[in-house]
Swiss-Prot record:
Annotated GO MF terms: nucleotidyltransferase activity
Family label: Belongs to the MdcG family.
Coiled-coil annotated residue ranges, if any: none
HAMAP family, A to Z: Malonate_MdcG (MF_00650)
NCBIfam families associated with the record: malonate_mdcG
Keywords on record: Nucleotidyltransferase, Transferase
Active site annotation, chain numbering: 135, 137
Protein name: Phosphoribosyl-dephospho-CoA transferase
C-alpha cells in the first residue's frame, strides 16, 4: 500500500464520500476533473482494506482539506511524492532560481528530495497553489545520521541564502519520519510520524543500528 504523501487516482466509477462536513460536492467535482488525492495518516477509523486520503483544495477554493476513506481496490494509480525536478517547471518564476539551487545542492551531497504539499499539487493539477510566501514541503529518504546532518545543514544554508522556507520530513530507515527542523534542534525526544499515528521517541532511537554498534 502507498505510504503517506503518495498521490493516488481513484477509478472513475469508485464511490467516494467526504468525511469533512459539507464537502461532498467539491470532492465529486475534484475527482471528476481527474485530480488525485494524497495518502494521509491513518486514524483507526478505517475499515479493513481502506486507506485514508486527503484532498487539499487550492487557496482560490478556501484551502480546505477534505478527508475521505477509499478502498485500496479502488485505486487506479499511485505514485510517490514527486521528485523535485518534476515540480520546478510548474513553480512560480520567483521560485525558480531557489529551487534549481536546491536541486544542485542536493545532488552534490548525493540526495534527491521529493516534494509534497502545495508545490506538488500545483504541478499535478495546474491550479495555483504556490505564492511568494509559500513553504516548499520536502521528503528526504535517508539511512544514516550523517545523511540527516548533511540535509539539515543544506536546508539551513539554503534558507539563509535564498530567503525561502523549507518544511518537510526526514524519512527514516524504518519508514517513519521526523520533521527536519525538529531534528535540527537539541531536544532529546522528537515527534516521530508513522502511517498510523505519532509518538515521541528518544533521538537515539532514530537510527538503532548505529546506536547498537
Amino acid at each position: 500500500m502507498a505510504g503517506r504523501h503518495a498521490l493516488v487516482w481513484l477509478r472513475a466509477d469508485a464511490p467516494s464520500q467526504a468525511l469533512t462536513p459539507g464537502a461532498q460536492p467539491r470532492l465529486q467535482a475534484w475527482f471528476a476533473a481527474g485530480f488525485p488525492a494524497v495518502v494521509a495518516r491513518r486514524d483507526g477509523a478505517e475499515q479493513p482494506g481502506q486507506v485514508r486520503l486527503g484532498v487539499p483544495l487550492p487557496p482560490a477554493q478556501g484551502k480546505q482539506r477534505i478527508a475521505l476513506c477509499a478502498q485500496v481496490s479502488d485505486i487506479a494509480r499511485s505514485v510517490p511524492a514527486l521528485a523535485l525536478p518534476e515540480v520546478i517547471s510548474h513553480a512560480p518564476p520567483q521560485w525558480q532560481a531557489a529551487l534549481h539551487a536546491l536541486q544542485a545542492q542536493a545532488t552534490a551531497i548525493g540526495m534527491q528530495p521529493r516534494v509534497f504539499g502545495s508545490f506538488a499539487f500545483q504541478a499535478v493539477t495546474g491550479l495555483p497553489y504556490v505564492h511568494a510566501a509559500s513553504d516548499v514541503d520536502l521528503l528526504w529518504t535517508l539511512d544514516t545520521p550523517t545523511q540527516a546532518h548533511a540535509v539539515v545543514t543544506l536546508l539551513q544554508q539554503w534558507e539563509h541564502v535564498t530567503a525561502r522556507r523549507a518544511d518537510g520530513e526526514l524519512l527514516l530507515p524504518d519508514g517513519n519520519a521526523v520533521n527536519w527542523r525538529e531534528y535540527a534542534g537539541d531536544a532529546q525526544q522528537v515527534l516521530v510520524k508513522r502511517n498510523d499515528g505519532c509518538r515521541l521517541l528518544p533521538r537515539t532511537a532514530l537510527f538503532p543500528e548505529r546506536c547498537a554498534a
